[in-house]
Amino acid sequence: MKPSFSINSNYLFKRFFGKNFEAGIELCLQIIKDSLQLSFQPEFALMIVSPWKMKRLNRQFLNRKGVTDVISICYNENEAGFSPAIGEIFLCPKHIFKQAKQFGCTPWFLLTRNLIHGLLHLFEFDHEQSLAFESVTMFFQDEIHETVLKLWNR
């Protein structure tokens, strides 16, 4: 049984990242599921938003100014254990494209990295808790990202 997710705008996502994006998203989620040895099939909603909407979400949920690339909203942040519906991830493709140019990498590279980052937040990996937890989270994120890039021929 594959992990499940929904995307609020398949058209926009295909426009920005190509037609095979769903397989890449499934791969990211499956690798995280396997790495964390989860016994359930995680579900999440992937929301594609404009820079304006992302700026509003950033202010509303994180009390920060400006546009960001990814925001995760965890449904079960204070519960013990995980439920199959774990939350929502908001991505801003225009901001990701802008960052890709700035950092000299492909939009797909940043998309997968941001998706993994967002998923880890849904699984309560919070790099802002402490410097030690940031190191563990970023190491785990980099390991998963490297695996995804090796397996996903893009």
Swiss-Prot record:
SUPFAM superfamilies: Metalloproteases ('zincins'), catalytic domain. Zn(2+) binds at residues 117, 121, 127. InterPro entries: MetalPrtase_cat_dom_sf_prd, YbeY. The keyword Nuclease applies. It is an enzyme of class 3 (hydrolase). GO terms for molecular function: metalloendopeptidase activity; RNA endonuclease activity; zinc ion binding. It comes from the Bacteria. Its cofactor is Zn(2+). HAMAP family: Endoribonucl_YbeY. Single strand-specific metallo-endoribonuclease involved in late-stage 70S ribosome quality control and in maturation of the 3' terminus of the 16S rRNA. This is Endoribonuclease YbeY. It comes from Mycoplasma pneumoniae (strain ATCC 29342 / M129 / Subtype 1) (Mycoplasmoides pneumoniae).
